[in-house]
Amino acid sequence: SSNQYLRSDFRVMGLVGAAHGASHFFHLVLPPLFPILKEEFDVSYSALALLTTCFYGVSGIAQTLAGFLVDRFGARNILLGGLTLLAASVIGYGFATEFWMLLLFSLLAGLGNSVFHPADLTILTQKVTPLRLGKAYGVHAFSGNLGWATAPIFVIYASQLFNWQTALILSGLLGLFIVLFFVIFGSDLTDTKVGSKIRIDTTVFSLASLNQNL
């Protein structure tokens, strides 16, 4: 029935939106803490900026490869793998005792982040009713901006309430919770290989995302 399709569409939008929002949230967990990290690791702001450069550089370069992996292994698997790697890397930030550890986790986080646009846009294209795809893409964009907006507030408040390590660990655990939520409620969001038409679309998504990151 139309109500069933409506519920299904909004469930898919919600799940994919939560994952996309988490990815954007993780984009901004480190920069608000730079003044603290500068003192903690006795490094310059230029060195700290390198963390962001590595994150976005790896993420942008790996986007196209992620599109091919989505075609080969299915969007759901790749999305869950990427979000798990990204969340685990943010938890790793919280356990870092040397600056090189932050750098390593930034590279891994960028790799995890690279999957999102190819994977989540493919899921939306496959699972949302065509008449509601515009709304789905709008929710997708909104969720990303919501992630950006909430990250600085969360990490600063948590770092003041606890410490910077706990703030980052809690941020990563939030991402793992979304992974678990996606596994439980998104089991039908296809692991099957996509057809040739979607494969072309996925590559376009990847190239568009690469351009956005560059």
Predicted features, each with a name:
Residues 183-207:
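Flexible cytoplasmic inter-helical loops of multi-pass small-molecule transporters
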Residues 28, 56-64, 148-149:
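Residue-level signature of mid-helix packing/kink "hotspots" within the transmembrane helices
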Residues 140-188:
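Helix-loop-helix hairpin linking two adjacent transmembrane segments in secondary transporters
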Residues 61-97:
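Conserved MFS/SLC helix-loop-helix module at the cytosolic interface between two early adjacent transmembrane helices
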Residues 105-144:
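Cytoplasmic helix-loop-helix junction between adjacent transmembrane helices
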Residues 15-35, 39-45:
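Extracytoplasmic
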Residues 89, 100-108:
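Paired small-residue
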